[in-house]
Amino acid sequence: MKRAICSGSFDPVTNGHIDLFERAGALFDEIIIAILINNKKKPLFPLAERERLLRESIAHIKNATIDSFDGLLVDYAREKEATAIVRGLRSNADFEYEKNIATMNKELAPQLDTLFLMTDPNYSYVSSSIVKEVASYSQDVSKLVPQPVAHALKEVYRR
């Protein structure tokens, strides 16, 4: 079975992420959407909320599961017996950053490949940071994120 991992903080998940998951799901037998727990960052949404929002947003992707991890992605990939890591690229800057990580991952886990998928041009400017910034000013982000996320952002910034 070909299993791939799509990892990130997903704080929050965006339509760009969903597009990546759908495309990865078409390429692999199974995809694991793995939420990275980074104790150095303070997320807007707690882990349980990010898991819920992801679950509601990817219900239509039948070969996707959601999990979380801390530590090195290559260690997690070995544990899950994944054959690939899938990363989305929005720009040349993303490529330079991701290429270095992929090279180190290959050094640590030679059996693990990294697959880069170019972001759909409709989402090339979308990031979780931009979404949070725009939502914090009570602006509509419903074209940038799944409906459950748009609702959750309204609730957070209503306070």
Swiss-Prot record:
Its cofactor is Mg(2+). It catalyses: (R)-4'-phosphopantetheine + ATP + H(+) = 3'-dephospho-CoA + diphosphate. Homohexamer. It comes from Shouchella clausii (strain KSM-K16). Pathway: Cofactor biosynthesis; coenzyme A biosynthesis; CoA from (R)-pantothenate: step 4/5. Belongs to the bacterial CoaD family. It is found in: Cytoplasm. Keywords: ATP-binding, Coenzyme A biosynthesis, Cytoplasm, Magnesium, Nucleotide-binding, Nucleotidyltransferase, Transferase. ATP binds at S9, F10, H17, G88, L89, R90, E98, Y123, S124, Y125, V126, S127, S128, S129. The gene is coaD. Substrate binds at S9, K41, L73, R87. Pfam families: CTP_transf_like. The record marks H17 as: Transition state stabilizer. Its main location: cytoplasm. One of its GO terms (molecular function) is pantetheine-phosphate adenylyltransferase activity. This is Phosphopantetheine adenylyltransferase. One of its GO terms (cellular component) is cytoplasm. Reversibly transfers an adenylyl group from ATP to 4'-phosphopantetheine, yielding dephospho-CoA (dPCoA) and pyrophosphate. Its EC number is 2.7.7.3. GO terms for biological process: coenzyme A biosynthetic process. It comes from the Bacteria. It is an enzyme of class 2 (transferase).
